[in-house]
């Protein structure tokens, strides 16, 4: 019915609102391709769009791989502390990631992970924040602490073992071999890669203790290598 009103060739003062209704109808059906032009026309004419309007347009744009547009809409939503802002920060991180702006994505995921409104979104955001912290380094806090926070918060999560492996590598690359070995000991299953890391780290720690004259301690490490 909404499309019929728009297609009858008569412009009315209600056209803007009709575009919104039609666009949201398509949005609710998951037909983002059809929703996009209607929501776009509505936002182009609406001087004071609601936060929900902006979020919907950002989400639709992202689904259609118009990620630069999505970033623009989401960025209008992140100046508040609200459930919608938490979601917007997470989706903003996804859009930045799609465009290769990983540092910006890291910051967006961090902000989303610090909000408690939606536990599922918080978990997803913290997962991405931890992964990017490991990959890029983290200007806000120690990467290993971020990964450990995920493990502590979601000890039985589906991604926790993956995070434990990341923690091993994070400690290894920072040169903290004792923490690396401790993290290795908490893995449920060890891959060939982590077994090799365990051998090498044990040997390095053994050599350190041997050079200090701590032969008994060194022997324990050498037995693990």
Question: What are the residue ranges of the model-derived segments?
Answer:
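Acidic, polar-rich low-complexity tracts and alpha-helical solenoid repeat scaffolds
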Residues: 1-225
């Amino acid at each position: 019915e909404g499309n019929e009103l728009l297609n009858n060739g008569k412009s009315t003062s209600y056209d803007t609102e009709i575009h919104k209704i039609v666009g949201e109808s398509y949005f609710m059906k998951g037909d983002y391709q059809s929703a996009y032009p209607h929501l776009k026309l509505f936002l182009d004419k609406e001087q004071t769009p609601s936060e929900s309007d902006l979020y919907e347009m950002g989400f639709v744009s992202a689904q259609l791989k118009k990620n630069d547009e999505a970033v623009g809409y989401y960025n209008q939503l992140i100046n508040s502390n609200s459930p919608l802002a938490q979601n917007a920060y997470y989706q903003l991180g996804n859009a930045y990631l799609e465009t290769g702006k990983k540092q910006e994505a890291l910051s967006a995921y961090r902000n989303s992970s610090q909000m408690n409104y939606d536990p599922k979104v918080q978990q997803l955001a913290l997962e991405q924040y931890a992964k990017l912290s490991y990959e890029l380094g983290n200007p806000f806090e120690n990467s290993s602490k971020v990964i450990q926070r995920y493990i502590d918060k979601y000890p039985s999560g589906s991604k926790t073992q993956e995070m434990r492996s990341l923690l091993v590598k994070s400690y290894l690359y920072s040169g903290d071999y004792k923490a690396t070995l401790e993290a290795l000991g908490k893995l449920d299953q060890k891959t060939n890669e982590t077994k090799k890391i365990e051998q090498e780290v044990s040997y390095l720690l053994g050599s350190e203790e041997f050079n200090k004259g701590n032969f008994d301690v060194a022997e324990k490490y050498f037995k693990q290598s």
